[in-house]
């Protein structure tokens, strides 16, 4: 019953979002991950039997979302961390390197050349909102754990959040390195 291209895109978006939510719910039930759903849901999804320490980090996300407009907008910018590296990487890998003295022609060529030239910086920069929001959520979760738990348990929450933060940082650096190396290798192959 889809009558237009716009309706088709909306249907695809709806099905994709539902599929992602089902996957998140399943992984949370299994204790593989924990999630905070913002907006109208404003819920934390975690298996407290398997990941009891994760709840403090997720509460930190909730505080970010609900305590200030700044952190709420930083959280909304997290999509840059998903789509930014994909877009920059795709452009860096498909745009030929300009030869010495070769000029750009037009807006699209200028834009893709700029992205190609600055792919490493742009990829890393696209992770800034996610890293900032994740680290702030951990910091707020650590503070709450320190207020509510025994020193031994609070230290376990702190260590849990440190490992979590490290995975985000390593992921950002690995993706940035992959885009940089991939672009250089492609240029080297192109020259051969």
Q: What positions do the PLM features span?
A:
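Sequence-level detector for tyrosine residue identity
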Residues: 35-36, 41, 57, 163, ...
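Long, well-structured alpha-helical subdomains associated
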Residues: 80-135, 139, 144-192
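Generic hydrophobic/packing signal
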Residues: 35-36, 43, 56, 138-141, ...
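Hydrophobic alpha-helical segments
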Residues: 25, 57, 134-138
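Auxiliary, metal-adjacent structural segments of Zn-dependent hydrolase domains
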Residues: 1-52
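Active-site recognition of the HExxH zinc-binding catalytic motif
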Residues: 50-67
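ATP-binding/phosphotransfer module of carbohydrate and carboxylate kinases, centering on a glycine-rich
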Residues: 71-72
